Amino acid sequence: MFVIIGWAVSMACIFGVFIAHGGNISVILHALPWEMITIFGAAIGAFLANNQMKVVKATGRGLGLCFKGSKYSKARYMELLALMYDILQKARKEGLMSIEKDVEDPHSSPLFQKYPTVGNDHHVTEFITDYLRMMVSGNLNAHEIESLMDSEIETHHQEEHAAVAALQRLAGGLPAFGIVAAVLGVVNTMGSVGQPPAVLGGMIGSALVGTFLGILLAYGFAEPLAGLLEQKVEDAGKEFQCIKTTLLASMQGYAPQVAIEFGRKVLFSGDRPSFSELEGHVKKK
C-alpha cells in the first residue's frame, strides 16, 4: 500500500511541477512507449543474463512481498515466544523425550496447533523442530548447536539477499540503458538534420526522454523496491535469531520464562512486546 502511495507522491511532484512550469507533457507521452520498450526491455534482458533462475524466482517472490504488509508484528512475536515457552516448559517438567512426538509431527502437535500463526509457517516450524530434535538426541552441546544455527541463518540471509542484490544491480543499470535510448534518439535526429528547427526540437526532446526515464525508473522505482525488500529480509532473519537465542538460553540451564526473555531482547524495538505484555500473553494461553 505504501509503495503505491510513495510512487503516486513522486509522480505527482515530478510531473506536477513540470506541467506547472509550462512543460508540454505530450512530448513525454509521445516518446514514452518506445523509450520504455528500449529501456525496460534491455534491463530485463540484462537481468535474466545476470542471474541464475533461482535468483530470478526469488526476486519475483520478493517483489510480491513488497506489495504486502509485513507479517512480522508484536502479536506474531508474542505467539512465537509463547510457543517456545510451552515447548520448553513441557520439556523441563516431563523431560526432553516428552516433546519427541511434537517435534516429529508438529502439524499434529497440540502445542503447535495452539499457535497457528507460527505453527503454519513451514520455515519457522522446520527451524524450531530441527534444533529441538538435536536437543532431544543429546549428541551436540550448546556451542556446536549455536555454530550450526549461525551457519543456517547466514545461508538463509545469503539466499534472501541475492534478490536484493539483483534488484540493486537492475537499478544501477537502468540509467545506462536510458542513455543508450537517448543516444539512439540523437542518432535518428542527426539523420533528419535538414528538418525545420521545430521538428528537430521535438525529436531532440523525445531523445532526452530516454535519459529521464532511465533515471526515474532506477531511483523512483527499482531502488526503493530493493531497499524495502532488504528490510523485509532483515525482519525474517530477526525471527530466526529470536528462536536461536531462546533455545540456547534453555540449553544453558535457564528456566523457560527467562529463556524467552533472552529471545524477546533480540527483537527490533518497534515489534518487541514489553515484559508485562509477554507475561500476560503467556499466562492467558
Give residue spans per PLM region.
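Hydrophobic faces of alpha-helical transmembrane segments in multi-pass integral membrane proteins
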Residues: 5, 9-13, 33, 37, ...
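Large intracellular
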Residues: 2, 19-161, 236-285
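Membrane-spanning helices that line or support transport/gating and their immediate boundary helices
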Residues: 55, 59-62, 203, 220-232, ...
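Helix-termination/interfacial motifs at the ends of transmembrane alpha-helices
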Residues: 8, 14-27, 145-148, 152-229
